[in-house]
Amino acid sequence: MSKESIYGLTMAQLTDWLMERGHKKFRATQVWDWLYRKRVTTFAEMTNVNKDCLQLLEDHFAIETMSEHVRQESKDGTIKFLFRLQDGNLIETVLMRHKYGFSVCVTTQVGCNIGCSFCASGLLTKNRDLSSGEIVEQIMKVQFHLDQVGKEERVSHVVVMGIGEPFDNFQNTVDFLEIIKDHKGLAIGARHITVSTSGLAHKIYEFADLKLQVNLAVSLHAPNNELRSRIMKINKAFPIEKLMDSINYYIEKTNRRVTYEYILIKDVNDHKEEALQLAELIGDKRHLSYVNLIPYNPVDEHSQYQRSEPEAISQFFDTLKKKGINCGVRLEHGTDIDAACGQLRSKQEKKKVKVN
């Protein structure tokens, strides 16, 4: 039977777990330090923790529950990791290098059921949720890589934008955020963390009430219901009116800016008309809104969709700017590897099917 990842415990949970079994509170602090500051990969390396405590941890938990299966490195320094989980499933994690530090994009589910018509992640439907420990371990695996190559750098930013819908795995995602923010551990600043949702409106309300101080991004991709329902089936459950109500609640509750992700697809959602509709949709919340324009990464299985022409991207950007909307065109990473989210995993799963 597979052991639970120790990375899945918050500091409070680890403390309670050890104290319930007769150990002093300071033991949890020691273990936490070994895990996240000294970054050991075995319990035996925790030299100042007594043998009884180490044996208890060894009997119940694992530090490593996934292994590197494939790694792709881009000329721009982006690295895409494909990790194999204990049950044989594969997940993607991406390391991106920026002027301001190292950012990691994590996955929250094995597959995705949101079913956006342009996305590689949904080519393989959801198998299961990841545990909070499996999400944290993605960060640790990337940090181990940075340690090994001697960069003397740390993961400074996290985006929860990999395969899956984070708000469909809500509690594990929230626990993950608490663990990586802990100031005695990885100490990743809340304002350096962004969680992206396809628009589960009821969970946006819940997320707002938690006041976590992390950034929220919403995958919008269309400014009206007719178009959004056509390319994102989630819109049928949470149409734009409901989605915007939840976003407005989030803004009022947190006074934090919301980022709207908008993938530009040629002749689908990249016209001036859509840019004007988007500006109108954001309306008087423009001071706490930012539109992230993303040139589409073509996917073989969705050949009906193509990247917008540079002229269309410029026109869309200029139209938003003239309407007073804060926006930018996302700097691309890993264009010479399987850049689209879910692309590498999908290719590897197809290879497994052919072999079998």
UniProtKB/Swiss-Prot annotation:
Identify the EC number(s): 2.1.1.192
Q: Which reaction does it catalyse?
A: adenosine(2503) in 23S rRNA + 2 reduced [2Fe-2S]-[ferredoxin] + 2 S-adenosyl-L-methionine = 2-methyladenosine(2503) in 23S rRNA + 5'-deoxyadenosine + L-methionine + 2 oxidized [2Fe-2S]-[ferredoxin] + S-adenosyl-L-homocysteine; adenosine(37) in tRNA + 2 reduced [2Fe-2S]-[ferredoxin] + 2 S-adenosyl-L-methionine = 2-methyladenosine(37) in tRNA + 5'-deoxyadenosine + L-methionine + 2 oxidized [2Fe-2S]-[ferredoxin] + S-adenosyl-L-homocysteine
Cellular component terms (Gene Ontology)? cytoplasm
Q: Which UniProt keywords apply?
A: 4Fe-4S, Cytoplasm, Disulfide bond, Iron, Iron-sulfur, Metal-binding, Methyltransferase, rRNA processing, S-adenosyl-L-methionine, Transferase, tRNA processing
Listed cofactors: [4Fe-4S] cluster
Q: Which residues bind S-adenosyl-L-methionine?
A: 164-165, 196, 219-221, 297
Where does this polypeptide localize? Cytoplasm
Question: Which SUPFAM superfamilies does this chain map to?
Answer: Radical SAM enzymes
Disulphide bonds in the chain: 105-341
Span of domain Radical SAM core: 98-336
Q: Name one GO molecular function term.
A: metal ion binding
Active-site residues, Swiss-Prot/TrEMBL = 92, 341
> Which residues are [4Fe-4S] cluster-binding?
112, 116, 119
Q: What GO biological process, any one, is recorded here?
A: rRNA base methylation
Q: Record's superkingdom?
A: Bacteria
Tell whether Lyase is among the UniProt keywords. Answer: no
Give the record's cofactor note, including how many are bound. Binds 1 [4Fe-4S] cluster. The cluster is coordinated with 3 cysteines and an exchangeable S-adenosyl-L-methionine.
Q: Does the keyword 4Fe-4S feature in the UniProt annotation?
A: yes
A further note on this protein reads: Reaction proceeds by a ping-pong mechanism involving intermediate methylation of a conserved cysteine residue.
What protein family is recorded?
Belongs to the radical SAM superfamily. RlmN family.
Entry's HAMAP family?
Answer: RNA_methyltr_RlmN
Q: What does this protein do?
A: Specifically methylates position 2 of adenine 2503 in 23S rRNA and position 2 of adenine 37 in tRNAs.
What protein name does the entry list?
Probable dual-specificity RNA methyltransferase RlmN
Query: Which species does the entry assign this protein to?
Result: Shouchella clausii (strain KSM-K16)
What are the leading ranks of the lineage?
Answer: Bacteria, Bacillati, Bacillota, Bacilli, Bacillales
